[in-house]
Amino acid sequence: MADTNETQPVGVARRDLMIAGAGAVLALGIGSAETAFAQAAATPALAQTVTPGKVAVERRGAVLLVGIDRPLAQNLLDPPILIGLGKAYYELEHDDTLRVAVLHGVGQNFSLGADLPALAVALASGAFPPKDGDFINSFGLRPPFRSKPVVVAVQGGVKYGGHELFLASDIRVAATDTTFSQGEVTRGVFPGGGATIRMTREAGWANAMRYMLTGDEWGAEEARRLGLVQEVVPSGNQLDRAVEIALKVAAAAPLGIRATLASSRQALAGEEVAFAALQAELLRLAQSEDRKEFVRALQERRQPVFQGR
């Protein structure tokens, strides 16, 4: 359930600022605090209007349900949510009674991206990223990696860092009302949470570029056509269907499941070089004049004029 103290809506300008460059902060906030702070610092620190998020965890036999629970803030990903996801994935990995997770978002949207102001504050204070070892990167950007599968159920908005979190799963179910976006290029940065690698691999080069280079949105049926979604179901049924699939996975031989994932990931080992190169490029764009121009334009309520520098 949502936090009852979370009663004030997020203003449009603040929401856009938080969403802008979400992938960059998500990728670096977990892997490199210094670089992530440079990205977050490019967005003005604004007063917080909503309470922190949380992750709701529920066990159903061998299935672990992991819910992003910040609906009144459109499930924007703040440090408590990112830490909660990392700890839930750690629990999945190290509890032998658990075989598969189902990731979902509470409320109207799966997630509209990252809460940049909250991340900037946490990075500056040293509260994020977590320093203990009971944590697995939910974006799969750095080790330790999980060896058990994640099924994701999405609805409403799946955008920016929320879309990259979605792409980091293994099996995907979407409601008919789902809208996807990976539009960081319209905000002076680029997708830094893995979309440039995963979306290109799964949807094909031109299909991925069609959306990542324009910032256009796409729907559930288009996502299925692109191969990013495996099933589209009536709105409201997505979580039940994801759990049904997860139960089938949980009934299979655990060693066989893990071996299948491990073998499949070995075929993608060359992508480690691309993942490793994300941080340097993110830092360069976070400090660019175009990124600063986007923030100024958002504050002045006008269209940005990018100069390519």
Where are these regions (language model features)?
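Crotonase-fold acyl-CoA enzyme core
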Residues: G11, A56, P79, L141-L255, ...
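Terminal peptide-recognition signature
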Residues: V66, R70, L85, L103, ...
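An acidic, glycine-rich surface segment that forms the CoA-thioester-binding/catalytic face
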Residues: L82, G86, Y90, H94, ...
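N-terminal twin-arginine translocation
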Residues: G11-D16, V25-T43
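Conserved CoA-thioester-binding segment of acyl-CoA-metabolizing enzymes
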Residues: A2, D16, A20, Q39-V106
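Short, active-site-adjacent cap segments at secondary-structure transitions
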Residues: Q108-L112, K159-Y160, S264
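C-terminal long alpha-helix characteristic of the crotonase
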Residues: T43, T49, P71, V173-T178, ...
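N-terminal secretory signal peptides
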Residues: M1-A13
